[in-house]
Amino acid sequence: MALLDIQNLSMAFGGLKALDRLHLAVEAGEIISVIGPNGAGKTTLFNVISGLYRPTEGRLVFKGEDLGRLPAYAITARGIARTFQNIRVFPNLTVLENVMVGMHCRLRTGVPGAFFHPPSQRREEAALRVKARELLSLFGDRLLPAAEENAVNLSYANRRRLEIARALASDPQLLLLDEPTAGMNPRETAESIAQIRQIRDRGLTVLIIEHKLSVVMTISDRVTVLDYGVKIAEGLPGDVANDPKVIEAYLGRKAQLS
């Protein structure tokens, strides 16, 4: 059984169908890239999976459970986390605190504990700080040395890495990354590819939206291509890159993607 099974999924905004009867199966341990021209429906798909949008029709089955009507916080608690195309860190919190924010769905201490700070709450917070530092260490020396600095002081690339670390803080099984290498130079991009592979090797499944086709070809186990909300191709990166429908969707003429 697929970890995530998207069945006949449609999402309409008035008369516009952003997703049209989409089928997609994501197996545990895969890195799958979702690509397509601007307006293809990629971010809409992520918004549906993460519970920001409720699908017009179809099913979104994760670990055997239909998530289609669950709110975003419940989907996070089930084991799905995401980053966003536009960076959403808390600039006036420290790097460490930003990661700890991502752990809220796993906290055992309730509202009374937040006010009265019993020993159990203090122990839990100490454990979360240790875990947050472990997550920062996944990114080498990019984040951990800045753990006590405000996130506003991070470089653009490191703010993107911080978003990934915060998403990992909720202990997901499926991680959705929306353009994780956007704005990065080639060296930063190569480093991020290695870090995403390392995350997969920790037992996670990764679904990526990415516009840099060199990244897609390098990192993906499989590639799914959307155009106007319809899946037009799916398969191994090399096969998809040479698919005439994909070339037409991107370039409108005979060419080869690279």
Walk through the language-model features, giving the residues of each.
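Glycine-rich phosphate-binding loops of nucleotide-dependent enzymes
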Residues: 1-258
